């Protein structure tokens, strides 16, 4: 395990500022997800941690020691790429063994025709084989060791890529959109396998994704990025329940949170309903209120039956436009009567 610290990381490509003064702390054995839209800088930040890119300014520390100017091989981190990056002409066993072989060879012996005959590789074959066997057992891919990547499914190739990173016994595990090439069903399966791998290995994981579901379900901590900045860092439920701003509130949660206008007045007035609220810190001007789709209870909607709302709940008139049947629940689209130009989404459980 290892603690990772990023201090004031900045990075630009030409005139484009990609990372804007990023500081982040990842504790020993923690699983943190860097999440955000494409182009927010999360993959660049991961590559800087790995040593594949250099920051313009700032410092990277692993276990309290600066690795900012160290080569990737000197950082003892392992990275899993989106495209797996497996050697197509090698078996699974050979793919898994390559990091162990290369780590034992001097630079001049790393040419393809020399690596398997170099003394270090021959001498350590039993150790290398034991490492491959251990990882294959851990990831349940022992029956695939003689196959080549072209003979594997997408999920199997992903497990081999994980194994090739894990076999090095790294301090930190870096993953860049590892599930993006898998279909929806397989993503759920491999997602749970990665979570299990984190729990059993105890390693520090830094995981890049644009998928908030992956980030929320797998992580101890989520770092939400936007245009090169960290908007909020915290436990998944902290970002969901206490978003730092509207951008965080809109990104976290599915369907997206409803944002409507409100009048501070006395307490808080939403349409014709007065809501209890503490607004001492609210300044004069426009006020927005966020309402999660799953926090709205639907009643008296023709053709639909729902559980009763809690007593004394505020009631707002709603105009239904579309209902999507998702099996155990419904996604209802429409508008509140007091603000008909703002689309509203309601996620409602069916009344069984």
Regions found by a protein language model. Give the residues of each.
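The feature captures the beta-strand-to-loop junction immediately N-terminal to the Walker
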Residues: 35-37
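Helix-to-loop junction immediately C-terminal to a conserved catalytic motif
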Residues: 50
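ABC ATPase nucleotide-binding domains
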Residues: 86, 91-247
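Conserved coupling/switch loops of ABC nucleotide-binding domains, chiefly the family-specific signature
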Residues: 56-59, 227
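Non-catalytic connector elements of ABC transporters
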Residues: 267-352
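Conserved ABC transporter NBD signature motif
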Residues: 58-66
